[in-house]
Amino acid sequence: MGCGSRAGKMEQHNAGKPHVAQKHCIGCGQCRKICAHGAPIITDKKCAIDHDKCLGCGRCIAICPKDAIAPDCDEIAEVLNYKIAEYAKAVVDGRPSFHISIVRDISPDCDCHPENDVPMVPDVGMFASFDPVALDLACAEAVNRQPVLPGSRLAETADPEDHDHLHAMHPNTCWRAAVEHGKKIGLGTDDYTVITVK
């Protein structure tokens, strides 16, 4: 999301407003506390989201201790990833660009969330490329090759057979959709070779 302005990031998230699975909601109010817009409303120890106030940022989804809040459907996460690729294309299209990713302190949630946990995997390193799609893919695949750090939230939830750490942490988020869409719109390719410099 680094290529989007603050307003652009809000627009990227705005495709889907969350809903609450009432049977899982315990009425703790964590969602209400984290929402800057007062969208979650607690009535009779159950939450409902006022979609007129909701901007779709997803903070309530991340903080819910019972996973009672979710986007309307899996398609919404895919749309978000498409928008991320489209915003990046709008910024770099027709301009010379070089991209650097520092892959360290890989937290289970977006770093904008104050309730974030310890890193899921060891630090990987720094990656650089003229191709932003290949760079993102190389970074994600490098993260997925790392061992899970004990004591991390991923260690508590990971399936030993699932080596996609990013998917294991957020099953409704299709990070690969951004890569595929980035290729489709001409942002970059999925062709990369890692050259290690020590």
Enumerate the language-model features and the residues they cover:
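Extended, low-polarity segments enriched in aliphatic/aromatic residues
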Residues: 1-198
